[in-house]
Amino acid sequence: MKRSKLLSLLLVGALSASLVACGSASGSTSGDTANSASTETTDSASSETTDSTGGENSKKPLVWFNRQPSNSSTGELDMTALNFNENTYYVGFDANQGAELQGQMVLDYIKANAATIDRNGDGVIGYILAIGDIGHNDSIARTRGVRSALGTGVDASGVIDASPVGTNADGSATVVQDATLDIDGKTYTIRELASQEMKNSAGATWDAATAGNAIGTWSASFGDDIDVVVSNNDGMGMSMFNAWAKDNKVPTFGYDANSDAVAAIAEGYGGTISQHADVQAYLTLRVLRNALDGVDVNTGIGTADAAGNVLEEGVDYRYSAEERSY
């Protein structure tokens, strides 16, 4: 019987000097593009690439990495793509775990600094959110993670609505809701003032320039109502930070632990989450190499290879077999 395996890496959020999580200063994998590696080039993380003809390609090893194949509307995993053949694997980070860490990072910062970040003293902590790609499962998870942690999420068919709110100056939007947070005897309202997908005129998503333009528009509309800036990744986050948030001392939170974002924490960037791209790269190549060599997929991962290479399960990575693979 066939089993399609899932390798998900554990995310580790390290405390920075500003009491928020940040990652290492090494390169990052942002989850901004769909990727796969195989002996045949594959361009999209969807079942549309699946060779259902039973031809020669259907027997070749296939390793999805960085972005799990998923439904572009709901973020639901594409089990057809994940079960392409017995040598199909996914290597990447747990999108939901990372999203939860980012949301908790923002919440912890607000709790620790509510009195100082409420810039106009109105008792409303207003945040704006840069969404990378409304059809990308990582982007969906990160949007849900922030809204879940802050209490601004609204249930939509059993999951938190990840739709952009547009603008929400008065808290009347239906895709989000106002939340309340009691801190040191004072009750604050948490409100998502605005959010949008950062797509440029050419159709490119996760676009930093679009985010930089958006923060200009939002700051003109909301002014001192903006207390926190949140982004699905550091590329967009740093664009908004450099364009406006840095000069106005508004904490900005991203994702990926890009080197410039980590360095910017010393200048007021709120925090970021590391995906440990070095481990992801090793696992992607290792799983593919093992499949091509016809050796046990765990070689050099959970069990040492001939050179002694081995990772520690539960620390460096986590392994989980797909429940539908039996």
Indicate residue ranges for each PLM-predicted region:
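Bacterial N-terminal signal peptides that target proteins for export
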Residues: 1-10
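Hydrophobic alpha-helical segments within soluble ligand-binding/sensing domains
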Residues: 83, 89-122, 141, 208-212, ...
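Bacterial signal peptide processing site
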Residues: 23-26
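Hinge/cleft segment of the Venus flytrap/periplasmic-binding protein
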Residues: 124-125, 130-131, 138, 150, ...
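Short, solvent-exposed amphipathic alpha-helices that sit
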Residues: 98-102, 137-191, 210, 214, ...
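C-terminal motif of bacterial Sec signal peptides marking the signal peptidase cleavage site
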Residues: 18-21
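Hydrophobic alpha-helical
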Residues: 37, 51-58, 62, 146, ...
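Acidic/His-rich segments in extracytoplasmic proteins that coordinate ligands and/or metal ions
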Residues: 34-37, 45, 51-112, 116, ...
